């Protein structure tokens, strides 16, 4: 049997993520500490306590990468190794680290810049993204078109993640 590590993109983060791993596994603590050194701030404080910053792309992306690699290192320490890796969007960077195509510090630095550039591209309050789950694609497309026609902004399906899951962009 083959084992695949699949890494998610942004959106699954929550305050408190990784705290148990950090407290109970030295290998996870090491990953968080290494990320802190690259970032120049405490990613563990953001992951464990700061829901507001976790909602900001600039901080969420390094937090998710760090958490993903910490969890992977714990699994590896417990004898679970990946035969293959895959990632969605931001998760691709975790997959690169897991497959040893990129080292962790390089990925943290790159993802920090990625998050910063994405935040600068759409300043706070000027837009949002929503994961729409369980609705028919045509209905989502129609709703976006109606919202655009009736409003002062733009609403469009931005990413068709999977059947029944569409990421929509709203720009005001």
Predicted ranges, named:
Residues 2, 34, 67-70, 93, ...:
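Residues within well-formed alpha-helices
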Residues 2-86, 168:
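Helix-rich "cap/lid" substructures immediately adjacent to catalytic or cofactor-binding pockets
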Residues 10-12, 39, 99-170:
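Alpha/beta catalytic cores of group-transfer enzymes, especially the acyltransferase/condensing modules
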Residues 87, 91:
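Gly/Ala-rich beta-loop-alpha elbow adjacent to hydrolase catalytic centers
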